[in-house]
Amino acid sequence: MIQQTEFRLSAKRRGCHLITREILDNLPKPLPKVGLLNLFVKHTSCALSINENADPDVRSDMEKIMNHIVRENEPYYDHVLDGADDMPAHAKSSLFGVSLTIPITDGRLNLGTWQGIYLCEFRDYGGARRIVATIYG
């Protein structure tokens, strides 16, 4: 059986945000006993990631690392009409990725003890983000 749902995440400021609870709240219940969850964000200036869910410093450090790797206001950027944060946001989105696949075991997401699902927002004002969740089971 395959199920699919689309939902909107609340707008977030720039940075890495733990969204595991928001994802779980929007998934159809019950989840299959065994399967896969694919999450896809329908935008080009944010990303999805799995990372540590306990220490908030990880979230701020990830933002700092991405800003170090992909800097704003580089003179070689051609795509600049939408603001200094736009082209770097597209590059960061490509580096991180816009989809995740998570195993489902015993009707629950089979994440590690310290793993959480992140929305990485790379725009200063990215707005609400749309997620497509496809459940295979």
Protein language model features and the residues they cover:
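Active-site histidine-anchored catalytic micro-motif
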Residues: M1-G137
